[in-house]
Amino acid sequence: MAPGIPAAMERPHFIGIGGAGMSGIAKILAQRGAKVAGSDAKESATAESLRALGATVHIGHAAGHLADDASCVVVSSAIRADNPELLRAGELAVPVVHRSDALASLMNGLRAIAVAGTHGKTTTTSMLAVALSSLGLAPSYAIGGDLEGPGTNATHGEGDIFVAEADESDRSFQKYDPEVAIVLNVELDHHANYASMDEIYDSFETFVGKIVPGGTLVVSADQPGAVELTRRVRDLSDLKVVTYGCAEDADVRVHKVTPRGLTSEVTVLLNGKFLTFTVSVPGAHYAHNAVAALAAGVALGIPAHNLASALGSYTGVKRRLQLKGEAAGVQVIDSYAHHPTEMTADLEAMRGAAADARILVVFQPHLFSRTQELGTEMGQALARADASVVLDIYPAREDPIPGITSALIIDAAKEAGAEVTAVHDQADVPAAVAGMAKSGDLVLTMGAGDVTDLGPRILDHLASGR
């Protein structure tokens, strides 16, 4: 039932094809039969998975990687103007398409669900994708992380539903025309692109305004930014607004979240009836993500009890409190949290799941601009751990900002009473953690950069007894 290949996407070339967002689009196009090619900075499991689908993936960036017959070049906001393949596209007059436009073209003609918000997008999108798949609806989906079960971040489904993570960081979420939009929260982040909360609200209002006539906005009734957004858009014509959360007036009210070890039991009140289901990750914030997914599915006309049962099929997404393993009695868990709100939520979730365990964090700040604006709050969040190791800032797409280092976070953490250590060389982290950890402890590798690679190395070091 799903559409075929958009004309401009028959022979696409992706610059940075290994990225979470780019690889998902490339996978769907390859599954639809497009001749996909691209390049990435380094070899990866993602590159191999794309090759398995028939894509050509080059390692490194060079003008010669771009085929003369490419129908378009797909880029994300992270690609610099001096990239040799992008310059070559200009010489060949090959159209350049932003990642968000490519995704929008794949969603055309389908019942789209776009999941937006400062935090929780990947988890909520994943929960929806798993639940809808479990119900036999064969959705297409594009997610910012790999699902634990299928082991992929995207797939082309034969059904008429497309679930997509909608990125607000560069305003690209304004390109979509969803039937259902989810807004989990609205906070100031991405400081290089937004100067104020007013700019954030304006951007989200534009996103909500793109919902198709008669469509539905599913929005948090608890988070202050989301509540303010609801106030601003509630009177838009031909828009249904469904709120969810603990607030007494929420349309889908969270009645109770009960921790059950590394899972949670969630009870909601919907249309005057109580409904209870299990979420296989700990923490109230993940329970609320599941309720948002439930509300979105109901907005599409799917029975709530079916969705509640199907949400139990969700087993997690990589890097979202993902258990990496255990050695010497120490569990190592990977967290993608990189904003103070996310950091606090994940630490509180782990504290609730394992109240007697010591929690040790290996934190890698993400982006100089974010550290400049939120470094103090990051340090305060780390005070919820029993001890922390803080690495140097992961720059991603940014150039350094003079005077902005991890010391901002470390100083704030110490001011808040935290036990914190700076480690500048990642090679020294496994030994540093082994020197701190004892049997029964939990170690969280936390951040949006390559800190995730340290989990297996920490486990190896612990197992060796060095």
Curated annotation (Swiss-Prot):
Q: Which residues bind ATP?
A: G117, T118, H119, G120, K121, T122, T123
Gene source species: Streptomyces griseus subsp. griseus (strain JCM 4626 / CBS 651.72 / NBRC 13350 / KCC S-0626 / ISP 5235)
| Protein name as catalogued | UDP-N-acetylmuramate--L-alanine ligase
InterPro entries annotated for this entry? Mur-like_cat_sf (IPR036565), Mur_ligase_C (IPR004101), Mur_ligase_C_dom_sf (IPR036615), Mur_ligase_cen (IPR013221), Mur_ligase_N (IPR000713), MurCDEF_pg_biosynth (IPR050061), UDP-N-AcMur_Ala_ligase_MurC (IPR005758)
Principal cellular location given in the protein's record: cytoplasm
The UniProt keyword set, sorted, is: ATP-binding, Cell cycle, Cell division, Cell shape, Cell wall biogenesis/degradation, Cytoplasm, Ligase, Nucleotide-binding, Peptidoglycan synthesis
In Gene Ontology terms, what is a biological process of this protein? regulation of cell shape
Pfam families for the chain: Mur_ligase, Mur_ligase_C, Mur_ligase_M
Q: In which pathway does it act?
A: Cell wall biogenesis; peptidoglycan biosynthesis
Which family does the record claim for this protein? Belongs to the MurCDEF family.
One molecular function GO term is: ATP binding
> Where, per UniProt, does this protein localize?
Cytoplasm
Summarize the protein's role.
Cell wall formation.
- GO cellular component, as recorded: cytoplasm
